[in-house]
Amino acid sequence: MLTRLLRRGTSDTDGSQTRGAEPVEGQRTGPEEASNPGSARPRTRFGAWLGRPMTSFHLIIAVAALLTTLGLIMVLSASAVRSYDDDGSAWVIFGKQVLWTLVGLIGGYVCLRMSVRFMRRIAFSGFAITIVMLVLVLVPGIGKEANGSRGWFVVAGFSMQPSELAKMAFAIWGAHLLAARRMERASLREMLIPLVPAAVVALALIVAQPDLGQTVSMGIILLGLLWYAGLPLRVFLSSLAAVVVSAAILAVSAGYRSDRVRSWLNPENDPQDSGYQARQAKFALAQGGIFGDGLGQGVAKWNYLPNAHNDFIFAIIGEELGLVGALGLLGLFGLFAYTGMRIASRSADPFLRLLTATTTLWVLGQAFINIGYVIGLLPVTGLQLPLISAGGTSTAATLSLIGIIANAARHEPEAVAALRAGRDDKVNRLLRLPLPEPYLPPRLEAFRDRKRANPQPAQTQPARKTPRTAPGQPARQMGLPPRPGSPRTADPPVRRSVHHGAGQRYAGQRRTRRVRALEGQRYG
């Protein structure tokens, strides 16, 4: 009996030393840890890392670095043959891509250091400048025509596409506009009137080039802004229908675009002309197999597949890196989607929340369209694969937007609290970034949030007592309205106004499910 008691005491002592969930003396435990110790700490190291304040910032920087590095490697591999044929050197296209990547890194660093208030202040001016650039590029002698589209400026041998800058400026200005109008509880008309006409002007200028791919990309940005702003579903569906119908009309209006659509519907109709690119891209993907032919060992780039370094670089990735490399690239874009939506849902500023979600949708939509027409699911539109294809202005604009997303990650409430409490980050010290400012909502939004958190019960008005009239005394002498001929037991129905603004006054302010999904902590 004594031996059993000694063994039991020894096991209890060992168990108390190994159990880490029990609080020890001197250790502070919060109310949540005391009530539910299992949920206070993550079970794995990966879960603990995801719960750190700067995890979103590290994730977006790492994903952008991996995509940019992979893009530079594949541009060098896919463009060496064409560069040597055109200029006698295999490094020309790759060198230009490196220079544009440096420009994008500088732009991303500037956006990373920029304050949110200054960004919103210059949003409209930046969009207006890009509209002027879209007008100038249509002037003969100023804009350069390539591949049937007049949409480039050429300066010192470097080409710049103003439509890429217009998309970036429109996303920033649209997020600023919708965030401000949503705070003021503006009507649906007031929310749509500045945004949609401005988008129509930009789309019309891009269509005049003409450029179907950039038109579709601008439509994605507009739909993303409308969707994540929480507008009514009928407004979003009508906008989606308008964008789809416009894209369909543009696809069959011009000769080369209609040829692409016909070749997509029937690839065997003209395999040597309009369907040649799509056919060769499928051959390259099939040639790669599971593990690919090896980096730099592809055959399609030897003048078999036109624009192998640009629009159809995903086919070269599938040929040289195989199915494994293609799935790895898709995994990187999936990680980018998770990171962008994580930052959007954790942001306290409505402007950063809306801009981050829209930008994430834009990059993913463009990647989906590019990969879709390479593998044959969509007709060829000419959209580039973000951060992978050889496109100078596209790469610079995308890196600048990633700088804005990283800036939003630093403005998460937990990140702001950690950085301002002195728990600095190595990456922040290396980049010499300033401390982020906590989000301070306007007084109107703060008052509305307090009213929403503490709703007041509806007060019932007491029934008004009517004086009794003496028998034979008229009601007019008692100060009462004359009685009608027929008795009335209830108040007459109030006729409501049928003015269009009455029903739409606060139609844009309904907290839909997609808005609640992006609602993070409101105050930093």
From Swiss-Prot:
Residue intervals passing through the bilayer: 56-76, 90-110, 122-142, 152-172, 192-212, 213-233, 235-255, 312-332, 351-373, 389-409
Pathway: Cell wall biogenesis; peptidoglycan biosynthesis
Extracellular face of the membrane: 77-89, 143-151, 256-311, 374-388
Cytoplasmic side: 1-55, 111-121, 173-191, 234, 333-350, 410-524
Keyword DNA damage in annotation: no
Gene Ontology cellular-component annotations: cell division site; plasma membrane
Origin: domain of life: Bacteria
GO terms for biological process, alphabetical: cell division; cell wall organization; peptidoglycan biosynthetic process; regulation of cell shape
The entry's keywords: Cell cycle, Cell division, Cell membrane, Cell shape, Cell wall biogenesis/degradation, Glycosyltransferase, Membrane, Peptidoglycan synthesis, Transferase, Transmembrane, Transmembrane helix
GO function term, MF aspect, one: lipid-linked peptidoglycan transporter activity
Predominant location category: membrane
PROSITE patterns noted in UniProt: FTSW_RODA_SPOVE (PS00428)
Pfam families reported in the protein's UniProt record: FTSW_RODA_SPOVE
EC number in record: 2.4.99.28
InterPro entries the record matches: Cell_cycle_FtsW-rel_CS, FtsW, FtsW/RodA
Cell compartment(s), UniProt: Cell membrane
Stretch list, region Disordered: 1-42, 448-524
Keyword Glycosyltransferase: yes
Catalytic activity: [GlcNAc-(1->4)-Mur2Ac(oyl-L-Ala-gamma-D-Glu-L-Lys-D-Ala-D-Ala)](n)-di-trans,octa-cis-undecaprenyl diphosphate + beta-D-GlcNAc-(1->4)-Mur2Ac(oyl-L-Ala-gamma-D-Glu-L-Lys-D-Ala-D-Ala)-di-trans,octa-cis-undecaprenyl diphosphate = [GlcNAc-(1->4)-Mur2Ac(oyl-L-Ala-gamma-D-Glu-L-Lys-D-Ala-D-Ala)](n+1)-di-trans,octa-cis-undecaprenyl diphosphate + di-trans,octa-cis-undecaprenyl diphosphate + H(+)
UniProt topology in membrane: Multi-pass membrane protein
Domain observations: Interacts with FtsZ via its C-terminal region, and with PbpB via two extracytoplasmic loops.
Physiological role: Peptidoglycan polymerase that is essential for cell division.
Quaternary context: Forms a complex with FtsZ and PbpB (PBP3, FtsI).
UniProt family annotation: Belongs to the SEDS family. FtsW subfamily.
Protein's name according to its UniProt entry: Probable peptidoglycan glycosyltransferase FtsW
Origin species: Mycobacterium tuberculosis (strain ATCC 25618 / H37Rv)
